[in-house]
Amino acid sequence: MKLHELKPAKGSRKVRNRVGRGTSSGNGKTSGRGQKGQKARSGGGVRLGFEGGQTPLFRRIPKRGFTNINTKEYALVNLDQLNAFEDGTEVTPVVLKEAGIVRAEKSGVKILGNGELTKKLTVKAAKFSKSAEAAITAKGGSIEVI
């Protein structure tokens, strides 16, 4: 076998269908757009959510609620993720970010109680769940709200 004899596997490369190139091609004249009408024109077609003039669903349904501008979103960390650190480590939001456990700090870090903690750690975070607090102190570690 030589380089010039190489060919792609049968059926692995499909020829692009060129429309509007003669009637015998099967996609000539109207190019697969049917006869006249909005969808046959260039740039034709209806906008997203358009229902033919009927009041669309998003306008029939009443508005509800609002977005609270004062809401705080915390980066969540579970107890089993803290096992990545050595015994006696001081775990802070900066350390968590460097370790790749937290991507963005947001309004701070909240420690949740999912999983089991096996290390004795000093954890500094904005918030702790009650179960996380209990688990950290039970292992001889300490918590500090920052």
UniProtKB/Swiss-Prot annotation:
Gene3D superfamilies: 3.100.10.10. Residues 23-35, 42-51 have a biased composition (Gly residues). One of its GO terms (biological process) is translation. It comes from the Bacteria. InterPro entries: Ribosomal_uL15 (IPR030878), Ribosomal_uL15/eL18 (IPR021131), Ribosomal_uL15/eL18_sf (IPR036227), Ribosomal_uL15_bac-type (IPR005749), Ribosomal_uL15_CS (IPR001196). Keywords: Ribonucleoprotein, Ribosomal protein, RNA-binding, rRNA-binding. The keyword Transferase does not apply. GO terms for molecular function: rRNA binding; structural constituent of ribosome. Residues 1-51 are annotated as: Disordered. Part of the 50S ribosomal subunit. Belongs to the universal ribosomal protein uL15 family. Binds to the 23S rRNA. This is Large ribosomal subunit protein uL15. It comes from Streptococcus equi subsp. zooepidemicus (strain MGCS10565).
